[in-house]
Amino acid sequence: SSSGLISMPRV
């Protein structure tokens, strides 16, 4: 999930 400015791809 994307948190603020940082988007973490769920793999």
Curated annotation (Swiss-Prot):
Biological-process GO terms, alphabetical: neuropeptide signaling pathway
Pfam family, one: Periviscerokin
Entry's localization field: Secreted
CC annotations in GO: extracellular region
Record-listed Valine amide modification sites: V11
Entry keywords, A to Z: Amidation, Neuropeptide, Secreted
Family according to the record: Belongs to the periviscerokinin family.
Annotated function: Mediates visceral muscle contractile activity (myotropic activity).
Protein name: Periviscerokinin-3
